[in-house]
Amino acid sequence: MKLSIVIPTYNEKETLPNLIERLYDEIEPLVEELHVVIVDDSSPDGTADLARNLGKKFHKISVIQRPMKMGLGAAYKDGFNHVLEKLDVDLIVQMDADHSHNPSEIAIMIEKIVDYAYIIASRHVPGSSIVGWNARRQMTHSVAGAIARFSAKIDIKDPTSGFRMFKKETLQRVEFDRIHSDGFAFQIEVLYQLKQKDLRGLEVPTTFVNRVEGESKMGGSEILQFIKMCFSYFGKK
């Protein structure tokens, strides 16, 4: 089984080396081939150059460097399209570079995806935990998730999770040109399409650790985009 991991980055020079090392130490032995795709928005801290240097040590690392900060969702679009067009893989993972997602959990995702179109590492199923969030952050996340589930009619407990695995044929059915969100609302738009196509997913427990290094990708414009997207789903089936 061949696996690709798409990782968007913006000022992740401090966190990326450890993540890449863990992926090649812990996940590469489980698969026939491992490809890592870094999508960097021209980070001022030199993340893209660092990723290229890591590629000299760890084989099969591709770096897509974009001209400016263009958003998390746009990064995933570019990363997924790169994988679908240029790489021969069976499974595709999306994850953050900031240590909030545990690479070792990819193993259980590989095991469970056999009977499903996609897997979500969920913060809201038994066995999950969240480390480092205060009450306000917990509330904001819960409200956003509830609004997304209600508006898009998605039967997923953690629709905003950014740690996911897809079968290649699942992503091939996603119409990326119909996804208008460049930010984190992209996560909801993908799930909405998968639901429309009757593709079944599974949520597995995760331990989510709030980022302690690097730079957050969340901004006010992304929140507004999320609200606009949710309103667009009202009235749709």
What are these regions (language model features)?
Residues 64-82, 91, 103-184, 211-221, ...:
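Acceptor/aglycone-binding surface of glycosyltransferases and processive sugar-polymer synthases
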Residues 88-100:
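Short beta-strand-to-loop acidic/aromatic patch adjacent to the donor-nucleotide binding site
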Residues 40-49, 68, 99:
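A conserved acidic beta->alpha catalytic loop
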Residues 2-4, 35, 189:
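Cell-envelope/extracellular polymer assembly enzymes that use nucleotide-activated donors
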Residues 12-27:
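Short, well-formed alpha-helical segments that are part of the catalytic scaffolds
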Residues 32-43, 64-65:
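Short beta-strand/loop segment that forms part of the nucleotide-sugar
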Residues 12-15, 43, 102:
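Donor nucleotide-sugar binding loop of glycosyltransferases
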Residues 154-155, 178-182, 191-208:
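Catalytic donor-sugar/metal-binding loop of nucleotide-sugar-dependent glycosyltransferases
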